[in-house]
Amino acid sequence: MSWDQVWIDVNIATMDPEISAPYGAITDAAIAVKEGKIAWMGPRSELPEFDVLSTPVYRGKGGWLTPGLIDAHTHLVFAGNRANEFELRLQGASYEEIARAGGGIISTVKACREASEAELFELGRQRLNALAKEGVTTVEIKSGYGLDTETELKLLRVARELGKHHHVDVKTTFLGAHAIPPEYKDNSDAYVDLVIDEMLTAVINENLADAVDVFCENIAFSLEQTERVLSTAKAAGLDIKLHAEQLSNLGGSAMAAKLGAKSVDHIEYLDEVGVKALSESGTCATLLPGAFYFLRETQMPPIDLLRQYEVPMVLASDYNPGSSPLCSSLLMLNMGCTLFRLTPEEALAGMTRNAAKALGVEDSVGVLKPGMQADFCLWDITTPAALAYSYGVDVCKEVVKNGKLVHQ
């Protein structure tokens, strides 16, 4: 056999549902890589003969390989910070009160409008590096802090550039309908017209987005406005997704599911009607424990219903300056278990297999098996559950992206 590299003395959490063992585990395993893809994988005792003199062999010292982590919901391209609002919230102000007073998203919009592409790129690069050190190999980045055509395009251009200059794959999402800008506060329908007629057209013309998202909520966009944006995006051939049921239940998840959305995100107030709609459409439910924690929310997502209806559960950081300034995917694994009562296996699936489905890349990443992209991490742990159990110690020892060792 002729391979580019071989890994031995490892255990593999493949996350492949076709393998019945927990985590799709193969113990005392080996994995071979050829031309950026997994060429062979299985028990080490069954490893075919290969040229050991010409093939790099890496020894995992009994650690665990997992698929590269996928953070399927971030807002990591932004300027400024909102530490002052953190103080206000702790003094009793609500997220809605801050937003209606011109704070929240709008304060970050001002900072992003003033920042240059170079400044935004450097800030984004630092944050992407932080995620990459924790084993993230694919990430989604949303716009939404421009709320005018020029700045929305600027944010998406920066996200695209990050993908070109970093080993982490970047999927971009246009979120022009993130909040109603001050200049349209008395005419939100006119802003929706701008999002559809001008912003989205420009985004498509420059090929800046893989998907389109909307914040469907009482403080943002109505169900009807949301459907207008998503329907237009779908007709243009873009994937669609939705911030839904975070603060109330407007029925956004059910509507998005009927349109074929890849995911609906937050969903603390999702009801059984919405869960059933997700199940029927194959739409993923993205859980964002960072925002739940940071905003000190008490309404839990309907985890048991999602299990009952077998809706794929995704776990993501929602990294952003206002409601989840927590740039750590490993922390989300722990929070997913401690706050939402996911099992460690469900949490890891939410950052691998299911996250890939939410981004539409499940044919290439998210599980480890022959033919898939060689994106994987070596962890200095004795069980995959340790990734969710403990936090703060660097256990990510190696990262392979597209068959290349990128972190050692």
Swiss-Prot record:
Cofactor, how bound (note): Binds 1 zinc or iron ion per subunit.
Cofactors: Zn(2+); Fe(3+)
Record-listed Zn(2+) binding positions: 73, 75, 243, 318
Record localization: Cytoplasm
UniProt cross-references to InterPro entries, sorted A to Z: Amidohydro-rel (IPR006680), HutI (IPR005920), Metal-dep_hydrolase_composite (IPR011059), Metal_Hydrolase (IPR032466)
Reaction(s) catalysed by this chain's protein: 4-imidazolone-5-propanoate + H2O = N-formimidoyl-L-glutamate
Coiled-coil portions: none
One Gene Ontology cellular component: cytoplasm
Entry-linked Pfam families: Amidohydro_1 (PF01979)
HAMAP family reported for this sequence: HutI
PANTHER family xref list: IMIDAZOLONEPROPIONASE (PTHR42752), IMIDAZOLONEPROPIONASE-RELATED (PTHR42752:SF1)
Task performed by this protein: Catalyzes the hydrolytic cleavage of the carbon-nitrogen bond in imidazolone-5-propanoate to yield N-formimidoyl-L-glutamate. It is the third step in the universal histidine degradation pathway.
The protein's name: Imidazolonepropionase
Taxonomic lineage: Bacteria, Pseudomonadati, Pseudomonadota, Gammaproteobacteria, Alteromonadales
Gene name tied to this protein: hutI
